[in-house]
Structures are given as C-alpha cells and as structure tokens.
Amino acid sequence: MDFKGESKKLELYDFTTVADELDVDSAALRAVLTVETGGSGFDAAGRPKALFERHYFYKFLANQPDKQVEAVEKGLAYPKWGEKPYPHGSDAVYAEIDAACEIDLNCALRSVSWGLGQIMGNNHKMVGYDDVQDMVKDAMESELKQLRQMAAFIKSAGLLDELQNKNWAAFAKGYNGPQYEKNQYDVKLADAYAKFA
C-alpha cells in the first residue's frame, strides 16, 4: 500500500473550527497535537506520522497462528508492549508497516497509530469508519481529516469533559493509557497548553 496522499497541512483556522465544534479551548487541542506528533501530521515524505505497535499486531494475529509465527520470526510482533524499542525514524517505521502489511493488511493497519492524534487503526469504528483502510486513506489526505479523527476519538472515548476542564491526568490516562505517568504525558500536556494559552 502506498501511504502517500495529498498531505494537506492544517490552516490555523482549522484548530479554531474543530475546537469550537468540541467546545474546547483551541490551545488545549493544540497541546494534544504537540505532545502526540510535534504538531505535524505528516513526515518529510508526505506520509501520515505513524507508529507501528508490534504487541497489537501480535494480538490481532492470535486467530491466525501461522501468520503470528511469521510476524514473530520477522521481529514484527511480540506479546507485550516494550519488549523491544520502537524503530528510529519514519522510514524505519514504514518499513515495518510495509512488512506487516505483506503478512496481513487489515491487522497491520489496525496496529498502527496514525496522524496528528496518533489514533490507532483498531479504533476506526470509534472515529466513524467501517473499514480501517478508509481511515488510513483519510489520514493520508489531510491534517484536517486527522484532526477530525482525533476529535471523534475524544468524544467516543468519553474524554471531552477532561479536555474541556484541562484535567490533564484524567485525559492522559484515557487517551494514552494507564502507563501515561511513566512518560509524564500529563505534565507534557500541561506544559504544551501553557505555551499556547
């Protein structure tokens, strides 16, 4: 799969538009984007910023043992998060994604966090897509579509109140998982918000 689309960048008013739709401070929304991806949804090659989660790939291949064994042998899957470090650089990440897609396209795309908000492909239904490939195609098209995916996830995951109230610890736990404190995700959100407020 070619992961290059139109790669349209956000306009400043896009933040305000989506923030108004969510009824949140645009600085709070920008803080999340800054912590997740540095505020940019595309890499230098015009592909959506992505992170391949090998432990999810392992999990999603559980009912396909031959594929799971192949993925493990190729270093693309393992049972627990953190067993191996993430690859450095977007090209290395996409090399893993491409290799995983050759094993199982759907499971591979579901195992990646995509774009500005780093929304897991497995959450495609939560953000309004019947098919993960459609979610990825929209992420390839524009940062605005990536931002809308993030907004839909925030609403679907029940995190809107936390973002509106700038309850960074509760938001971080819901958005980034129970390990958020390990990386000081809540502190990073508060610091980023202070820069934009």
Task: Show where each model-derived region lies.
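Catalytic glycan-binding domains that act on GlcNAc-containing polysaccharides
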Residues: 1-197
